[in-house]
């Protein structure tokens, strides 16, 4: 009983499933463990590498997503799924975001140390409701999604050598940084162009590093803000 992510992952030259590979069923892996795997791949010195990381990120239970010493926003407990604990839940969730910031910073530092043409593209597949309004929605699987579930980050980083090799990508993404975009529409076209992949499936009008990028109307179906 595997997910599509599992099937796609197993098509890679190298793949690791941290939790599934553990003999301990109660094992709760940290996203930090992915960095060791990245270091291992980078050490191979391959000229071309495409690395995909699927993090736990900010999934509930939030307090399991960051080390206790990284609990910056307090109190972060108890975090039962009840409106009365909303402040604690938000603190714990914000701690996961802060931890993800640290994770991405360390990943970028690892890439910088390679002194090669490198680019990183990061996004989330969903946001989160934490009892934000009178509907008292929680998590992210509502039949009718809210703004909080749809609003996600979309982050691009390029190394200095990448910017020098492909200045048009850096200049274009800088011009496009304040434009509206849909991550589900733009992620893969942007990734393909960053990697210089030529395919009939590539749509540069949806790539934010392309001069051809075109903002398209954002449609919400039965969405109440």
For each of these PLM feature ranges, what is it?
Residues 68-91, 169-173:
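A solvent-exposed, charged loop/short amphipathic helix patch at secondary-structure junctions
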Residues 13-21, 136-141, 168-173:
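Short glycine/proline- and charge-enriched loop/turn segments
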Residues 50-57, 94, 119-124:
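Short beta-strand segments
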